[in-house]
């Protein structure tokens, strides 16, 4: 008997008035590009319903809330952990994960007054199971179509780690990827459906750069990240991370958000296949020409 494909739309409703929560932690450059594009579009299929940050000092979140007349929710992660007797806000320990769950539950209560059909994680740092409540689109500074020998995504990790890994593998280019986040407990970091990637952002390799990267990678062996994060490899990665943001993130993320709101994407959870207008399209490429 032929297996039946279980293809499902990501969105629960098909409406011309979708509402999105915009989550951010830092400078908010991705959020800025997405919100500006949306505001300029007279036929926009979604609207921002709330801006969310875990940092009381996030000026970008305050600015966007005022600029676009959108409510702002600030849920202080550091203060919450301190109130529960913890100085560090990580999820590496059982106690840390328990507090993160409490923090997320409190965030859910804070978001109840606002309509949310999906969320845009535009540089939102905390890992949170709020991603189980509605689809959460996230930009990632790595090409998630690149797999290791076991068929697993290779360029995963936070901040500049995917760029560093691409450099250590001597890859010819970088890409930004947009995924629908899943719980970090179920798929690990950077799991979830891959909706789109940016066009390649070339790495300008020279013999000297190859040697510098290889030497720095060798010197890292046996050391903790805090001991080497500002080494030559880290500095090169930081430069390329900025190039990737401009030529990758800012190109692919706004377009994927609009295509997502338009209902173009669907997903077969059994096979992990993403569909675009009914055709398999995992890792669909977006270029500046289509902006």
Predicted regions and their residues:
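One-carbon transfer enzymes
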Residues: 1-291
């Amino acid at each position: 008997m032929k297996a039946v494909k279980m293809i499902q739309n990501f969105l629960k409703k098909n409406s011309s008035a979708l509402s999105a929560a915009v989550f951010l932690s830092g400078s908010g450059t991705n959020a800025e590009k997405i919100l500006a594009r949306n505001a300029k579009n007279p036929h926009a299929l979604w609207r921002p319903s709330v801006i969310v940050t875990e940092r009381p000092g996030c000026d970008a979140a305050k600015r966007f809330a005022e600029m676009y007349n959108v409510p702002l929710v600030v849920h202080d992660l550091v203060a919450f952990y301190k109130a529960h007797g913890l100085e560090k806000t990580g999820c590496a320990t059982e106690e840390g994960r328990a507090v993160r769950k409490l923090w997320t539950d409190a965030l859910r209560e804070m978001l109840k007054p606002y309509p949310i059909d999906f969320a845009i994680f535009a540089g939102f740092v905390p890992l949170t199971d709020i991603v189980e409540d509605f689809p959460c689109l996230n930009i990632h500074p790595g090409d998630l179509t690149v797999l290791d020998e076991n068929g697993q995504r290779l360029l995963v990790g936070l901040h500049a780690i995917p760029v560093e890994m691409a450099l250590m593998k001597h890859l010819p280019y970088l890409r930004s990827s947009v995924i629908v986040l899943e719980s970090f407990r179920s798929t690990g970091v950077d799991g979830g459906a891959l909706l789109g990637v940016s066009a390649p952002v070339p790495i300008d390799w020279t013999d000297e750069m190859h040697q510098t990267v290889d030497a720095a990678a060798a010197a890292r062996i046996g050391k903790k990240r805090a001991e080497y994060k500002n080494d030559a490899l880290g500095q090169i990665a930081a430069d390329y991370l900025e190039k990737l943001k401009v030529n990758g993130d800012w190109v692919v993320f706004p377009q994927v958000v609009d295509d997502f709101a338009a209902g173009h994407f669907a997903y077969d959870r059994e096979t992990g296949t993403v569909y675009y207008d009914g055709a398999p399209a995992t890792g669909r490429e977006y270029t500046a020409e289509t902006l």
